[in-house]
Amino acid sequence: MISYHLKIVIFLFLVSSSVAFSNAHAFCFKEAGERYSVDPLLLIAIAQTESSLNPQATNINRRGTAKESIDIGLMQINSVWFNQLSSEWGISKQDLIKNPCQNVYVGAYILALNIKKNGVNWKSIGAYNAGFSDKTEAARIIYAKKVYNFYVSLLAKNREFVIANASKGVMIK
């Protein structure tokens, strides 16, 4: 259950984020990382893995099941989250595409939930994409390795340079 205070923080963020924001902070990796105690470079590595830093990215997920889902925006927020985001915070699918900053905040929130559930480890990061099911272990490991490779590459660079360029949608290799 999400605490009352967290709902207030998210509501205030949504109100403030509806105002136009500068290009330098358009994707809010640093701010979202601070809010959810996640390294902004890790968020950037996830965004690179998920969407190649494309805020308009939309993908259909079939994953071998009859039920398909949709991933949208920089952090490729999955449609399984849409009802909760809409009912609890008033965030629509269109908001996640139109507001890259909001998309990053939601992605950071989802990652923070994984970390809270399973600890600070690569399984939690892999679960961002593949979930915690035993059936998705192979996909989780592959995904975590992709994020890890981007993350290690980003750690070797100047942190502020990486964050500034990611905020402009520039992939850093």
Where are these regions (language model features)?
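Catalytic glycan-binding domains that act on GlcNAc-containing polysaccharides
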Residues: N23-K173
